[in-house]
Amino acid sequence: MAIDENKQKALAAALGQIEKQFGKGSIMRLGEDRSMDVETISTGSLSLDIALGAGGLPMGRIVEIYGPESSGKTTLTLQVIAAAQREGKTCAFIDAEHALDPIYAKKLGVDIDNLLCSQPDTGEQALEICDALTRSGAVDVIIVDSVAALTPKAEIEGEIGDSHMGLAARMMSQAMRKLAGNLKNANTLLIFINQIRMKIGVMFGNPETTTGGNALKFYASVRLDIRRIGAVKDGDVVVGSETRVKVVKNKIAAPFKQAEFQILYGEGININGELVDLGVKHKLIEKAGAWYSYNGDKIGQGKANASNYLKENPAIAAELDKKLREMLLNGGNGEQPVAAATAEFADGVDETNEEF
């Protein structure tokens, strides 16, 4: 239905006034003068990139990664940093837990010489540092480890045992309101690592919840629930963890998908193992008995040997990665995809939250 001429003139005048007062681009038609594609950064896991539906985590947004202890939360964020640094991006790590291991980070491919790191004294200080880095426009990825360790100043200055109901939740709520717009303008990805707590007295449903109040849940474009589901063994020796990640919330593609991969101790995500599994599943790699073949050439007997072959031949691994992304992600470039994986509803953290 056409808008009459007087309304069009009035609208044009209003738009002109808004742009004059607030700057060009402050208001626009959704399909005009802007890219609708979402720029993403790889998570370091091909199956998780596919499950996210956009080829990775979205720039300019807030992401929450939560799970039990030793489930791989920090490892996953370090893999994101390594992937971002390979693209020439600047990254920062806000270590509120004071537990970052630079030797481990280096093993995962992180350039620790160019990684900005802060160990703030209070939660307010950590969030102000995040805001300052974002407003600089020079930092592409910021990791906060973790929300549970963002202790309000009043709690630190008080006595142990003092009641500080809702302080952390209010602090996070104020920070989200301030950060969300700045992150979008600077096209900076902000990832919060969070811990799980148990709600007391829950008889039915999931008693798990995350710390820091409800604000982060609402402002996050992506929420990932990461869990350790088994052990990776070399003989009788445990060498890693079988890990499952559920996409509990996703504003950039369909949610509720999940990915499974291995995290090897001292190495990080076993991307070559993922390539073998996905290659077999989508018939790019042939499997006859225990032997794996690619383009007619045998690459190994058993998954471990096939993975080692890809590790020793990065050009073939890159070719296989590219083919899988083109096959499984729409757009063919691995950056603006819709996942082809089967949707599975997550039984993730309950949306009701309490302050701990």
Swiss-Prot record:
GO biological process: DNA recombination; DNA repair; SOS response
PROSITE patterns: RECA_1, RECA_2, RECA_3
Binding locations of ATP: G67, P68, E69, S70, S71, G72, K73, T74
UniProt keyword Lipoprotein, yes or no: no
Keywords tagged on the record: ATP-binding, Cytoplasm, DNA damage, DNA recombination, DNA repair, DNA-binding, Nucleotide-binding, SOS response
Alphabetized Gene3D superfamilies for the sequence: P-loop containing nucleotide triphosphate hydrolases
InterPro entries recorded: AAA+_ATPase, DNA_recomb/repair_RecA, DNA_recomb/repair_RecA_CS, P-loop_NTPase, RecA-like_C, RecA-like_N, RecA_ATP-bd, RecA_C_sf
Keyword Cytoplasm: yes
Matches recorded under HAMAP family: RecA (MF_00268)
Function: Can catalyze the hydrolysis of ATP in the presence of single-stranded DNA, the ATP-dependent uptake of single-stranded DNA by duplex DNA, and the ATP-dependent hybridization of homologous single-stranded DNAs. It interacts with LexA causing its activation and leading to its autocatalytic cleavage.
Protein name listed in UniProt: Protein RecA
Gene assigned in the entry: recA
